[in-house]
Amino acid sequence: ETSSVEFSKDDPDSVSPSDGADADMTAQPEQMEQEIDEAVSEALSSYQFSADNFNSMTSVLRGIGEQGDKSIVTVSSGKQDTDIFGNPVENTGDYAGAVIAESDGEFLIFTYADAVRAADSINVRFSDGTKIAGTVRQIDEVLGMAVVAVPSGNLPEEERKKVQVLSLANSYTVKAGDVLVGIGGPSGQVHSLSFGTVSYVARNVQITDGLTRILYADISSNSQTGTFLINTAGEMVGWTSESCRSESCTDRTAAYTISSYKPILERLTNGASAAYLGILGQDVS
């Protein structure tokens, strides 16, 4: 009997600790708020941000990214074709994948549908160079998501111990100004890193069969290779996609928020397809 994978479900109305603090502050007298604002402004104006401070901050972010990179693998797909002379050739492509669960002796890897769609062969390469044949657990063509499974026992024990399952965050708590780290393939190469901040969180965005939230961030990403966004706790808050980019915000990276899609990802991980009615809402004036 196989065990099913479950991901925690999040409350859309949940707030981050800092949001809660802000809510409490609004109940205080206006005079206290003004005094606090003046004190903060004075402290910031007198603070000298040195190169050492900057290097220290980037060092911390680099450490978060390197830790998250332990969950990243390379998903290689092979497609049989023929050259101009009719000789058989195999076209291959590399994509980033993130290990999001380990169950029944298998690593379950979240990747992009482009990585496995119509592939004749799938190989997953781990950081030590070990390649393991993978199988598609399920694909969601609407969102461009896919889950690939590989037997964890085929990986050398020492390397298997290094692989870390990437936790899924409560992305409903993400707000503008939060610092994010991009892992996967933000530079177009798997195992690259990038840093940035959330510029805007778009709520109630119309998608097939419902509403979602989209993160916009000033962070380098590559949705063709695959980029996953993690918070400073090292948890995945979303993944980038060109399909969710707004025409009015083309200079920012756009990402689906993970909390909105945990139920779908859970179904894919357990081999079940995601059901859609195909309804896309529209504002009527």
PLM segments and residue spans:
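N-terminal targeting leaders that route proteins to membranes or the secretory/organellar pathways
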Residues: E1-I84, S121-N123, P156, M236
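Gly/Ser-enriched beta-turn/beta-hairpin loop segments
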Residues: I84-N91, I139-L143, L155-R160, V201-L215, ...
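A conserved glycine-rich beta-strand in the N-terminal activation segment of trypsin-fold
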Residues: F54-G63, K79-Y112, K131-A133, V165-S167, ...
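Terminal peptide-recognition signature
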Residues: K70-V75, G97, F107, T111, ...
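Flexible, gly/ser-rich surface segments that form the specificity/activation loops bordering the active-site cleft
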Residues: N170-G210, R245-S248, R267-L268
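Active-site region of chymotrypsin-like
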Residues: S152-V165, S194-A254
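C-terminal cap/linker of serine protease catalytic domains
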Residues: M236-S285
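Conserved active-site neighborhood of the chymotrypsin/trypsin-like protease fold
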Residues: F49, A101-G184, G188-Q189, S223
